[in-house]
């Protein structure tokens, strides 16, 4: 009995620690968002002396927003950059979109590469290799096809690339679009994701997504170039790790990495979340424990039980109050990331928030159940440590 009492006491203390950790993350991410995001920073160097940038753009397929997203890069206000458009297949409809933009902006330093180069299992790396090999500037900007930018986005990122910084990344967010699936995505990328993403980066953990990353080419080459990361599916994590291991710091851009895909649905969002969870579990096995207990409903149950065990408070009353506080702070976080009025009502937010939180356990269990993922051009079986093998159809 004494052992059981000791174990319960330990679990209760764990619940209290969890409470303070999670609410520290809430406050930290909200404060950082308010102080840093969507703020115009002072120029660190004269406009004319900004370093040259080679933009690598991996493309596969088209969606209704692709041409508009790509065009924002041709309209960047930056003194010296090149656009390297990379398409894997000759018959990909993205080729025609690229040719149309190249014809519309003949004075821009832009090139189209078709065919890729097979150097590993990662299809994104394979696609980017021809562009990377001819990139002529010291800074490499890898930016996904679904991202749109403002004219001064690259200037903002380049100003963050100070002497000791080796990588500048943008916090992923989602543009205003119509429909509930768009609201669901916006709620996730404005609440749960930035809470973890910002807290990790501010406290020294290297958390980077590859949607929009500006990196020093020299440092990547020291790590073996893009080819060194072709064995991984989550190449962005391992590129960031290689840069950090060489003593370089990271900086977050003041502008978000604005996702603006023209194709979206609840099922696509769910599949994407499951794929990301699978990658995190295989790269960082501690995710198996940390991820579920960092979500609202599970955390509220654990903390509510701890409050009942220590203070004899009613579990369900505490659970409801804790969830309500979480819900309110998430809304504050979302408004901060948005940087302006939301495109949906508070009722839409409440419904999307509840559905997103309710999906978390299903997403996590689905990720544990099956270690294979479908991504871009194939299916892959993940291995512990982040490597993968392609599953070939027989």
Swiss-Prot record:
InterPro entries in alphabetical order: Ceramide_glucosylTrfase, Nucleotide-diphossugar_trans
Location of the active site: 236 (proton acceptor)
Catalytic activity of the protein: an N-acylsphing-4-enine + UDP-alpha-D-glucose = a beta-D-glucosyl-(1<->1')-N-acylsphing-4-enine + UDP + H(+); UDP-alpha-D-xylose + an N-acylsphing-4-enine = a beta-D-xylosyl-(1<->1')-N-acylsphing-4-enine + UDP + H(+); N-(9Z-octadecenoyl)-sphing-4-enine + UDP-alpha-D-xylose = beta-D-xylosyl-(1<->1')-N-(9Z-octadecenoyl)-sphing-4-enine + UDP + H(+)
Motif (Q/R)XXRW: positions: 272-276
Pfam families the record matches: Glyco_transf_21
GO molecular function, one term: ceramide glucosyltransferase activity
Chain location of the short sequence motif D3 per the record: 236
Enzyme Commission no: 2.4.1.80
Known pathway: Lipid metabolism; sphingolipid metabolism
Motif D2, residue range(s) on this chain: 144
Tissue: At the late gastrula stage, weakly expressed ubiquitously. As neurulation proceeds (stages 15-16), expression moves towards the dorsal structures: involuted paraxial mesoderm and neural folds. In the tailbud embryo (stage 28), expression is restricted to the notochord. At later stages (stage 35), expression remains in the notochord and also appears weakly in the cephalic region.
Segments on the Cytoplasmic face: 33-195, 305-309, 370-394
GO cellular component terms attached to this protein's record: Golgi apparatus; Golgi membrane; membrane
Compartment list: Golgi apparatus membrane
SUPFAM superfamilies: Nucleotide-diphospho-sugar transferases
UniProt topological domain (Lumenal) ranges: 1-10, 216-287, 329-348
The entry's keywords: Developmental protein, Glycosyltransferase, Golgi apparatus, Lipid biosynthesis, Lipid metabolism, Membrane, Sphingolipid metabolism, Transferase, Transmembrane, Transmembrane helix
GO BP terms, alphabetized: glucosylceramide biosynthetic process; glycosphingolipid catabolic process
Entry's transmembrane regions: 11-32, 196-215, 288-304, 310-328, 349-369
Membrane topology field: Multi-pass membrane protein
PANTHER family: CERAMIDE GLUCOSYLTRANSFERASE
UniProt similarity note: Belongs to the glycosyltransferase 2 family.
Function: Participates in the initial step of the glucosylceramide-based glycosphingolipid/GSL synthetic pathway at the cytosolic surface of the Golgi. Catalyzes the transfer of glucose from UDP-glucose to ceramide to produce glucosylceramide/GlcCer (such as beta-D-glucosyl-(1<->1')-N-acylsphing-4-enine). Glucosylceramide is the core component of glycosphingolipids/GSLs, amphipathic molecules consisting of a ceramide lipid moiety embedded in the outer leaflet of the membrane, linked to one of hundreds of different externally oriented oligosaccharide structures.
Protein name: Ceramide glucosyltransferase-A
